[in-house]
Amino acid sequence: MSMERLQAALRKAKSPLALGIAPTIGEVAAPLKKQFEEMLGSGNLADCEALRYHAMQLLELASESGLAAVVIDADSFLPYGMMGADVLGNLVSAARAKEIYCIVDYRTTRPAAYLTCENAPDGVTVLPYVGGDCVPTIENKSIFATVRTDNETGGEVQNLIAGDRPLYVALAMQCARRGAGLVVETGYSLDVKELRRRCPSAFLMLKHCDGENATPAFDDYGHGAMVVDYTLRKAEDVEKAKKSLKEWVSIV
């Protein structure tokens, strides 16, 4: 199973840290953006190619730093239409060539369309509020259900009570029973503790979460979860993040 490959890769890397790739054109260095504008003219094409170069540099950083996985935000590229989809495909191919586990954050409700194509990533994220249909069984691929989001109005739905638990917990339990990983974006230890208590065997993907708040997600051997960091830009950033995580979580 693909989830088992991910956990094996994290154990091999001796770190639960993954690199999040969600660039905006504003992050691209001005000289680099200007270079593409001089070649291609101002507009979406130049911006998209600048994003491609920038994202490939981040992927190279993950490879050189020995990280096991990357999580790519589809929304960073798909607004550019077919050009953005091409960049996204290039990143998935490059991650595969570098033997980096690649998850694309599509937040789709129909993951089969993305996981059965020729250039499919190792896993995708889904929004589970359509029910179990968003967690199909696809050989050697993983699905991660985004059950707890950090957007301002997320709690309007996620905190509704379903029986004796919040709706996000009820959905997480259903998705976990189908073999999905669970995505938590809030960074709050209480959310992490509750999901780990209710879903003891589920793999948790934690975004915007420091080592202290992430600790409840891991077992005594440092297994069972992954922390995604979107702020890493240099090798020293990665090493600092690894060291900080290791103060709380050690993979055996």
Predicted segments, located by residue:
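Structural preference for beta-strand elements that scaffold enzyme active sites
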Residues: P16-G20, A68-V71, Y101-I103, D122-T125, ...
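A C-terminal functional module that forms or caps the active site or interfaces directly
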Residues: R52, L182-L232
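Active-site-adjacent beta->alpha loops and helix N-cap segments on the catalytic face
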Residues: P79-A94, R110-A113, P128-K141, G187-C199, ...
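C-terminal functional extensions of proteins
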Residues: F218-V252
